[in-house]
């Protein structure tokens, strides 16, 4: 699987509880633009509406060669999941504090676009600082271990 884009802000701003891999109903020009890496997941999120999940505010830049048949960069895109997964996600989102955020866009082995969405809970400012401190100390410990093993 080839990862095209990641939502680094999601890993920083949210605590990821569970992730799902979803297909996406895209136009041909959108798939070609994604293949070129012209996609941004910043500020994008997913929402459950009428038994379907939609990806909102995901920016896919227009494909140069598509001229008049090009797509709208910020249109809402339907995500494809099993009904039971959609129901499960819908129930979790109704609980207070949960959000659905895209974390990765990738191509699977068959060349299909897949979007990894995650059920997340927002982090407070002090939690973000704690995570950064822990990451730094872990990195220092690993560097020290590596240094001593030489």
Placement of each model-derived feature along the sequence:
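Ribosome-associated translation termination/rescue signal centered on the conserved GGQ peptidyl-tRNA hydrolysis loop
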Residues: 33, 40-50, 54-83, 88
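Beta-rich strand-turn-strand
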Residues: 82-118, 122-124
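C-terminal low-complexity, charged extensions that often adopt amphipathic alpha-helices
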Residues: 99-102, 142-150
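Flexible glycine-/small-residue-rich
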Residues: 28, 48-50, 57, 117-121
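Broad gene-expression machinery/nucleic-acid interaction feature
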Residues: 21, 41-43, 55, 76, ...
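Arg/Lys-rich, often Gly-containing low-complexity segments of ribosomal proteins
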Residues: 7-10, 38-39, 65-77, 82-84, ...
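A positional/architectural concept
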Residues: 2-52
């Amino acid at each position: 699987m080839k990862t095209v884009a990641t939502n680094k802000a999601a890993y920083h701003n949210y605590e990821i509880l569970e992730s799902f891999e979803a297909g996406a109903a895209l136009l041909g020009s959108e798939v070609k633009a994604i293949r070129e890496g012209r996609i941004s997941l910043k500020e994008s999120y997913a929402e459950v509406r009428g038994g379907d999940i939609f990806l909102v505010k995901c920016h896919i830049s227009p494909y140069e060669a598509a001229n008049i048949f090009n797509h709208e960069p910020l249109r809402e895109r339907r995500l494809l999941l099993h009904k039971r997964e959609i129901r499960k996600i819908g129930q979790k989102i109704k609980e207070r504090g949960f959000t659905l955020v895209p974390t990765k866009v990738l191509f699977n082995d068959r060349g299909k676009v897949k979007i990894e969405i995650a059920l997340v809970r927002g982090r407070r400012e002090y939690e973000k600082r704690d995570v950064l401190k822990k990451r730094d100390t872990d990195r220092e410990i690993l560097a020290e271990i590596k240094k001593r093993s030489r």
